[in-house]
Amino acid sequence: MGNIVRKLPIGIQSFDKLRTENYLYVDKTEFIYQMAYQGVPYFLSRPRRFGKSLLLSTFKAYFEGKKELFRGLAIEKLETEWKEHPVLHFSLNAELYDSRKALENMLERQLREWEKIYDTGGEGITYSGRFMTIIRRAAEITGRKVVVLIDEYDKPLLRNLHNEELQNEFRELLTAFYTVLKDADPWLRFVFITGVTKFAQVGIFSNLNHLNDISLAPQYAALCGMTLPEIEATFQPELHALAEANKLSYEDTIEKITRRYDGYHFDFRSGIALYNPFSVLNVLSKQVFYDYWFASGTPTFLAEMLRKTNYDIRELDGIEVSEVSLSDDRANINNPVPMIYQSGYLTIKSYDERFRLYTLGYPNEEVKYGFLNFVASMYAHLPETETPFYIGKFIQELESGNTEAFLTRLKAFFADIPYELNDRTERHYQVVFYIVFKLLGQFTEAEVRSAQGRADAIVKTPRYIVVFEFKLRGTAEEAIRQIDDRGYLIPYTADEREVVKVGVAFDAATRNLGEWLIEKTL
């Protein structure tokens, strides 16, 4: 195993700490200079753990004139003045926000800290009034315009997505607080606000009509995250050590990192593909391929949203959405797709410029299989740890040609669904079938029907091709006949592997698999 002695910035959100303690850094400072030069108020939406906090910390160091921290970086050759400005840096990331009082306490602590620095005497009755006084006083004392950096502005709202009463209270508080930024414009040099999603009802969007949303802007697509050239330029020793530890070639290592952690697209013109920085740094550090980003946070609010909307998750991979739905109100509980996209579980795959339609899909294997495994536990009401056990056994049985054992285990999987869920609709069971066969795709080639004229599911192993047809209202014999009559086997006539036909009938009374037939072709 390679001996890595360089420091990887896993979880480092302070640019000052990163530079003074010699952590590796993917240089984003050219973006910093460009945005600071423009000077307009910015908003950026990106998924969690994508580098938003470090980005704001970098802006803070830049506007505080800490030139020494930027030695050797792109901005060193661009900036000549290094003017120091008062910076109000505010993160809403650290609280649970389970009550109105929790948000009030957070605002109170932050305002008191600033009031002490700028000696305002706590002037102003409301939070917004005190915030305005702080901005004005900071500009007066220093003789320089103020920089405001707000990190994870939407955290209180995301924490309470399904608590309408608390949501409304938080909106009221935050709208009044953020609206100050419009009236304080004469004293402001730069404003940058980050979050996961865009709550259009909050005042920063309804009142700050000059806020520049760069979330889908091609020129800022690579502002957060890592590109492959950046990874290869910054982490060469770590990449070679990862290859050695996993007994892979350098090329195969890059291919595996790409397959598992690449694939994020935040615009439709630049073609820039981004790697998840959290997963990349972790795999380079631990030298083990694992779903680091997905394991670092469970998308419970998305699961709750899917439950409430009864959304068909089979439509997620390849769904088309309008440009407006991604750039307007993304926190619409009646349409979970924009929120799923903003949270990082879907990404842009293509864009139809004529009709202004985005096609979305899972960015990579980590997200695809992590999300499907999580949703499987939700639909089947099984612990998340049990689904991988089933999938592993399914694969072993199909690879050994024991289709009978596979179907018996699949029946047991359905039997484990609690009895109280047995009033689920037909679609519920179709979705469970879909999830199971999609999850098989982690380990072998598996397809689930997405169009007419194809079998319900096809699994290809080194020795077998297994073609499945399921009948919700019909017999196993009818399912086998449909495989033959519709020519589902024709694409495999020249294949040397053994082809197996499987017809399965669904038993409405037991809400489970009923009879099945297995036929092997000569």
Language-model regions, residue ranges each:
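Phosphate-binding site recognition
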Residues: 1-425, 440
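A short acidic/basic microdomain associated with nuclease active sites
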Residues: 434-450
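Domain-level recognition of nuclease-like catalytic cores that cleave nucleotide substrates
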Residues: 491, 497-522
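Feature representing long, continuous alpha-helical segments
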Residues: 408, 427, 431-435, 481
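Conserved catalytic cores of phosphodiester-cleaving nucleases, focusing on short active-site segments
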Residues: 433, 455-472, 486
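Metal-dependent nuclease catalytic cores in nucleic-acid-processing enzymes
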Residues: 177-184, 338-346, 434-439, 482-502
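Mg2+/Mn2+-dependent nuclease catalytic core
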Residues: 167-172, 472-489
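C-terminal amphipathic alpha-helical interaction region
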Residues: 445-451, 457-461, 492
